[in-house]
């Protein structure tokens, strides 16, 4: 995931 897009998916 992206740190900018915190969709809750910590990739």
Swiss-Prot record:
Compartments it resides in: Secreted
Expressing tissues: Expressed by the venom gland.
A GO-annotated cellular component: extracellular region
Keywords, comma-separated and alphabetical: Secreted
Main location: secreted
Protein name listed in UniProt: Venom peptide Ocy2
Lineage: Eukaryota, Metazoa, Ecdysozoa, Arthropoda, Chelicerata
